[in-house]
């Protein structure tokens, strides 16, 4: 309302002043026509204009004092009031008001001052006192007349619902200062805390608390909360300035792109930002909106999670740059600033700095950029523009950016500590272009070639040859599990020889290799003669067999040498040796079952026939294989059950050992006397599998006879191969078949002792489960005589 509007009741003289002026400080009469009514007290705590212009508020504490008294110095007080108003107006003109703080104060926000109080929709004033009524000077009759006169003279046509306060100041409407839920609650709390009483019955404030609108002279922008009563004050444009939050928040900024959270994060492909100069000297600026930009993609994995896709913030951190997988010649600006991707959780808070050229980029869609953060180096921007293949039309490969004074690795990373004149070292991937070096299968040293059928070094080759030809009886001082490597291969020759046999080394492999080489040379010579004389037809005397023979198949399926695991450091005993032999025999039976199933034609027999043949012949196979190992390794003088268990004469002298060892030594001595070859041994071993059948015959008897005759012929071929076309072939065939017949007597003696130790529980000799099952099934058949021996010669 107008400050000059009279508040005096009709028929009453003017009062020159207020009685409160002398006792309570300076009194200003805002309304010159006010008579005997409200006076305004300006607190003495703000005596100067300078004190009134503090942090967030330029207002003074205004207190109302309703009294019935009057003073005599009204004119002087009015002059002081006018002077102070003029000073305040000049100060407001000199200083531009802070809109954001004014709006915050008008909404009742706490701005952080120590003496500022949140007062709902009211402004915050220094806490000097509260509104109160002077005791003993109250005239409610005059107050009622002043309020009645005020209500008649201050009606507003625009807003008929607005009300005026008892002080004569217009109350701000809800349209000008909308109330939020928090403001209303805060106002109610302040009313309760500041409400005074006079005599315990009179309330200090009316229901609609009046405030002073000291911000009406300020000009609000179109986005002010006063324009919309339904809008939240927190959405005011006065408090939010996008240009203040990020320098890249422009509408046309090329860095602000849309992206999806399920897409890969790939670098931005930007246009050439190098300023182009016309002939006249003017600079041609390219429009960012005309550039087709790809989407900024984000990716999500176990460690990196992007929460706000596509938001990029630019921070000025100084001359920092980085090498990236881009090509071209130009760099953005003279001074690179850090570019960080929001939402990426990076350890240590590091940022990715793009130092790239965008003249002409060739970025494949399935490749990701490689960043290399480089510490700041004072290098001019003109030096940054130099890279390999510079020029606007030239393209550099991915990650080929180069800087002067640095060598670039082939994988795209640059090393700031290398000299520029030193060539870059090759990458690790390109260094190892060839295959890895081949290692010896025995000692893991570098292999020199394939020796005796196995890839070994020269040392193991010589050792194996000397061990076989010298017929050494190696014994391990430990548990037959010594480590054989390049350094410790000479510590234990027994374990080294065992490892050679496990690898498959064989002296016969060298002879076979020589034969194959001779056949290849002969074939090459025949083809050369044919090419020289095309009209001449040559028929070779014997063509090499292209199909594998039965003997070659038997060589392939031959079981490997097994180890007994016998501890030679413990004193020997007959019980411990026999138990170890039984355990070794059980594993050898399992290997024999696999070997028998691999024999050509044997799996065509009935399954019961296969099991019957194995039950009848398992001791034949064990004894004959033992004789062969003893013949090859000790010339038939020792029994080589395993590389780690060799029965010498001392062990043969143990109780219950000599008689059984004597039968087994007979086999090895016969093989030594006849000088049986490896092919002959393989055929004879197969025939021993087919040497015993039940008396009633097999279910597949005819097929069994055919298979047996096939391997008899194969034994004849092995004899011819060894002796050649000589008259002694039949004699040798007789000798070998005679040895096969003698195996029945040897096996009968061994089985008799085996059955005895199995049935005699007092000896406490252990048998493996599979071997015990076979013996249990075989004992009744032998006791009943239900066995038919297939002999070559009649007795």
Swiss-Prot record:
Ranges for region Modulating: 1-439
Zinc finger region(s), NR C4-type: 440-460, 476-500
Domain NR LBD, residue spans: 542-776
Entries under Pfam families matching the protein: GCR (PF02155), Hormone_recep (PF00104), zf-C4 (PF00105)
Entry-linked PANTHER family: KNIRPS-RELATED PROTEIN-RELATED
GO terms classed as biological process: adrenal gland development; androgen metabolic process; associative learning; astrocyte differentiation; cellular response to dexamethasone stimulus; cellular response to glucocorticoid stimulus; cellular response to magnesium ion; cellular response to steroid hormone stimulus
Regions of compositional bias (Polar residues) in chain numbering: 151-170, 185-196
UniProt feature, compositional bias: Basic and acidic residues: 1-15, 173-184
Annotated source species: Rattus norvegicus
PTM entry text: Acetylation by CLOCK reduces its binding to glucocorticoid response elements and its transcriptional activity. Increased proteasome-mediated degradation in response to glucocorticoids.
UniProt KW Phosphoprotein keyword: yes
Region described as Disordered: spans on this chain: 1-24, 67-103, 151-206
Residue ranges, compositional bias (Low complexity): 75-96
PROSITE patterns: NR_LBD (PS51843), NUCLEAR_REC_DBD_1 (PS00031), NUCLEAR_REC_DBD_2 (PS51030)
Omega-N-methylarginine, modified sites: 24
Name this polypeptide is given: Glucocorticoid receptor
GO molecular function, one term: DNA-binding transcription repressor activity, RNA polymerase II-specific
Role according to the record: Receptor for glucocorticoids (GC). Has a dual mode of action: as a transcription factor that binds to glucocorticoid response elements (GRE), both for nuclear and mitochondrial DNA, and as a modulator of other transcription factors. Affects inflammatory responses, cellular proliferation and differentiation in target tissues. Involved in chromatin remodeling. Plays a role in rapid mRNA degradation by binding to the 5' UTR of target mRNAs and interacting with PNRC2 in a ligand-dependent manner which recruits the RNA helicase UPF1 and the mRNA-decapping enzyme DCP1A, leading to RNA decay.
């Amino acid at each position: 309302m107008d400050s000059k509007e009279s508040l005096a009741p009709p028929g009453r003289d003017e009062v020159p002043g207020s009685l409160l002026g002398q006792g309570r400080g300076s009194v200003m009469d805002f309304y010159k026509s006010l008579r005997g009514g409200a006076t305004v007290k300006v607190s003495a705590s703000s005596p100067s204009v300078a004190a009134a212009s503090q942090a967030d508020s330029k207002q003074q504490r205004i207190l109302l004092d309703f009294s019935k008294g009057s003073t005599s110095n009204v004119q002087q007080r009015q002059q002081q009031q006018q002077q102070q108003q003029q000073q305040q107006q000049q100060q407001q003109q000199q200083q531009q008001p802070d809109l954001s703080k004014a709006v915050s104060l008008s909404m009742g926000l706490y701005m952080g001052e120590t003496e500022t109080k949140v007062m709902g929709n009211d402004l915050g004033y220094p806490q000097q006192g509260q509104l109160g009524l002077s005791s003993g000077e109250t005239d409610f009759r005059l107050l009622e007349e002043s309020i009645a006169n005020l209500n008649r003279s201050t009606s507003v046509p625009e807003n008929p619902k607005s009300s005026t306060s008892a002080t004569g100041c217009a109350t701000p409407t809800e349209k000008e200062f909308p109330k939020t839920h928090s403001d209303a609650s805060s106002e109610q709390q302040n009313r309760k805390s500041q409400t005074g009483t006079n005599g315990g019955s009179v309330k200090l404030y009316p229901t609609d608390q009046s405030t002073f609108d000291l911000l009406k002279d300020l000009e609000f922008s179109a986005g002010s909360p006063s324009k919309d009563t339904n809008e939240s004050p927190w959405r005011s444009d006065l408090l939010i300035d996008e240009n203040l939050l990020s320098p890249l928040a422009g509408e046309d900024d090329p860095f602000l792109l849309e992206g999806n959270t399920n897409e890969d994060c790939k670098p931005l492909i930007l246009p050439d930002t190098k300023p182009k100069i016309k002939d006249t000297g003017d600079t041609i600026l390219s429009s960012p909106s005309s550039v087709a930009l790809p989407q900024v993609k984000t990716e999500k994995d176990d460690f990196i999670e992007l929460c706000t896709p596509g938001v990029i913030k630019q921070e000025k951190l100084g001359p920092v740059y980085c090498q990236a997988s881009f090509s071209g010649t130009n760099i953005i600006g003279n001074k690179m600033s850090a570019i960080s991707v929001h939402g990426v959780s990076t350890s240590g808070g590091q940022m990715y700095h793009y130092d790239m050229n965008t003249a002409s980029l060739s970025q494949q869609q399935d490749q990701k950029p490689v960043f290399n953060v480089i510490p700041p180096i004072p290098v001019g921007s003109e030096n940054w523009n130099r890279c390999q293949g510079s020029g606007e039309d030239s393209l550099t490969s991915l990650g080929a950016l180069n800087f002067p004074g640095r060598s670039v690795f082939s994988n795209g990373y640059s090393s700031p500590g290398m000299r520029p004149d030193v060539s870059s070292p090759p990458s690790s991937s390109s260094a190892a272009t060839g295959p890895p070096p081949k290692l010896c299968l025995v000692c893991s040293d570098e292999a020199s070639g394939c020796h005796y059928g196995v890839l070994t070094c020269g040392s193991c080759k010589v050792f194996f040859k000397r061990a076989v030809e010298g017929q050494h009886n190696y014994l391990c001082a430990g548990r037959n599990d010594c480590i054989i490597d390049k350094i410790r291969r000479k510590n234990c020759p027994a374990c080294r020889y065992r490892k050679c046999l496990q690898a498959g080394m064989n002296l016969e492999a060298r002879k076979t290799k020589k034969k194959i080489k001779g056949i290849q040379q002969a074939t090459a010579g025949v083809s050369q003669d044919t090419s020289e004389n095309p009209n001449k037809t040559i028929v070779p005397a014997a063509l090499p067999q292209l199909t594998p023979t039965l003997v070659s198949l038997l060589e392939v399926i031959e079981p490997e040498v097994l180890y007994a695991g016998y501890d030679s450091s413990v004193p020997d005993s007959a019980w411990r040796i026999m138990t170890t032999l039984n355990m070794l025999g059980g594993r050898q039976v399992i290997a024999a079952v696999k070997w028998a199933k691999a024999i050509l034609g044997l799996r065509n027999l009935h399954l019961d026939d296969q099991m019957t043949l194995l039950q009848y012949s398992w001791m034949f196979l064990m004894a004959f294989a033992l004789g062969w190992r003893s013949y090859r390794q000790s010339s038939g003088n020792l029994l080589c059950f395993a590389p780690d268990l060799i029965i010498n004469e001392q062990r043969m002298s143990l109780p219950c050992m000599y008689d059984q060892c004597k039968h087994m030594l007979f086999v090895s001595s016969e093989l030594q006397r006849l000088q049986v070859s490896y092919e002959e041994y393989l055929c004879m071993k197969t025939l021993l599998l087919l040497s015993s059948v039940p008396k009633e015959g097999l279910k597949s008897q005819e097929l069994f006879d055919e298979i047996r005759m096939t391997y008899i012929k194969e034994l004849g071929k092995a004899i011819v191969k060894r002796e050649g076309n000589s008259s002694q072939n039949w004699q040798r065939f007789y000798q070998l078949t005679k040895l096969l017949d003698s195996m029945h007597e040897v096996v009968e003696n061994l089985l008799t002792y085996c059955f005895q130790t199995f049935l005699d529980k007092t000896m406490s000799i252990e048998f493996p489960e599979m071997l015990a099952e076979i013996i249990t099934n075989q004992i009744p058949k032998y006791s009943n005589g239900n066995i038919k021996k297939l002999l070559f010669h009649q007795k």
